Amino acid sequence: MKNLFLFCRAGYEKECAAEIQQRAAELNVGGFVKANNNDAYVVYQCFEEDGGDILVKQLPLDSLIFARQMFAASELLADLPESDRVSPIVAALSDVSKAGELRVETPDTNEAKELSAFCRKFTVPLRQHLKKSGSLLAQENPKRPIIHVCFIGPGRAYVGYSFSNNSSPYFMGIPRLKMAADAPSRSSLKLDEAFAQFVPKEEQEERVRSGMNAVDLGACPGGWTYQLVRRGMMVSAVDNGPMNEKLMETGQVKHFREDGFRFEPQRKNIYWLVCDMVEKPARVAELIEAWAINGWFKEAIFNLKLPMKSRYKEVMAILNTMQEILKENGINEFQLQCKHLYHDRDEVTVHLWIRPSQAWN
């Protein structure tokens, strides 16, 4: 297929477009971007007929900051007839064989969501016809490709496929997380989503486990501390402001009424460092770099608040600088990931894992 369809947050189409333009160029897949403000999706139109196929296979979704989900796509199917929308879609998917799942989706906008009831109903007959044509297996198979049909408006859809090992497990790339009734703030969901994004499920028992020591810089009122506590960790919560009383009653939290930028841990046995401070992103990055150089943590998750303009450029500059500084200070083995999570707004979430191949004492 010729195109790559990418889901993103509404208002971040420019950032998603700039990123895919750069990343596709690195893979020598030429093309141009089609994007409109607040559409919540971007289409990268490749010059080569198989450009979308190449990108969906060779470009890791997890390496993209602003894309929630992506799939190799056909040209837009416009003006699908109300009397028979199924046949043109089945025909457009004739090159897809034995897919393991069907997702009929929309972009994440209020206008597109009005189609969600239709999408649910439409899935049933479409699934039956795709099984008959051989594009879809009779039984779902999580190891096979996923068929995507994304309606961007009534009778207008992009169709295509993604590989299950390079795809979000969620419809539209949106995780469905529940806000706990006793969580101190909605920001709690950001860290919950970050753990799911950056730590594979099969590794969570080892890397996100009870008894670990953690530090939360800028913790008040305790949204991120809450996620650490519910996972059984012992938390040093650093903030001049007050902490949630119920969190303090758990006995797992020690509150340090200090400036997060000046705090130094008393003991050097911290596995997780987390930080969600409303501060200039470069300053937060410098703080994390200092902690890494001092050897004060093994893994960190932190948020970078984004400027109003040049957001992709700013994020990449900060991440590139961080990599350079770590290497200059003898930290040559690390994993650095960044994602604009669903529960993020004008910010991105970064994960830094120092020396992943070395066991934690």
Swiss-Prot record:
<dbReference type="GO" id="GO:0006364">
    <property type="term" value="P:rRNA processing"/>
</dbReference>
<dbReference type="GO" id="GO:0008757">
    <property type="term" value="F:S-adenosylmethionine-dependent methyltransferase activity"/>
</dbReference>
<keyword id="KW-0489">Methyltransferase</keyword>
<dbReference type="Pfam" id="PF01728">
    <property type="entry name" value="FtsJ"/>
</dbReference>
<comment type="subunit">
    <text>Monomer.</text>
</comment>
<feature type="binding site">
    <location>
        <position position="187"/>
    </location>
    <ligand>
        <name>S-adenosyl-L-methionine</name>
    </ligand>
</feature>
<comment type="function">
    <text>Catalyzes the 2'-O-methylation at nucleotide C2498 in 23S rRNA.</text>
</comment>
<feature type="binding site">
    <location>
        <begin position="220"/>
        <end position="223"/>
    </location>
    <ligand>
        <name>S-adenosyl-L-methionine</name>
    </ligand>
</feature>
<keyword id="KW-0808">Transferase</keyword>
<dbReference type="GO" id="GO:0032259">
    <property type="term" value="P:methylation"/>
</dbReference>
<feature type="binding site">
    <location>
        <position position="239"/>
    </location>
    <ligand>
        <name>S-adenosyl-L-methionine</name>
    </ligand>
</feature>
<dbReference type="Pfam" id="PF18125">
    <property type="entry name" value="RlmM_FDX"/>
</dbReference>
<feature type="active site" description="Proton acceptor">
    <location>
        <position position="305"/>
    </location>
</feature>
<dbReference type="Pfam" id="PF21239">
    <property type="entry name" value="RLMM_N"/>
</dbReference>
<feature type="binding site">
    <location>
        <position position="259"/>
    </location>
    <ligand>
        <name>S-adenosyl-L-methionine</name>
    </ligand>
</feature>
<keyword id="KW-0698">rRNA processing</keyword>
<protein>
    <recommendedName>
        <fullName>Ribosomal RNA large subunit methyltransferase M</fullName>
        <ecNumber>2.1.1.186</ecNumber>
    </recommendedName>
</protein>
<dbReference type="InterPro" id="IPR002877">
    <property type="entry name" value="RNA_MeTrfase_FtsJ_dom"/>
</dbReference>
<dbReference type="InterPro" id="IPR048646">
    <property type="entry name" value="RlmM_THUMP-like"/>
</dbReference>
<comment type="similarity">
    <text>Belongs to the class I-like SAM-binding methyltransferase superfamily. RNA methyltransferase RlmE family. RlmM subfamily.</text>
</comment>
<feature type="binding site">
    <location>
        <position position="276"/>
    </location>
    <ligand>
        <name>S-adenosyl-L-methionine</name>
    </ligand>
</feature>
<dbReference type="GO" id="GO:0005737">
    <property type="term" value="C:cytoplasm"/>
</dbReference>
<dbReference type="InterPro" id="IPR040739">
    <property type="entry name" value="RlmM_FDX"/>
</dbReference>
<dbReference type="InterPro" id="IPR029063">
    <property type="entry name" value="SAM-dependent_MTases_sf"/>
</dbReference>
<dbReference type="InterPro" id="IPR011224">
    <property type="entry name" value="rRNA_MeTrfase_M"/>
</dbReference>
<keyword id="KW-0949">S-adenosyl-L-methionine</keyword>
<keyword id="KW-0963">Cytoplasm</keyword>
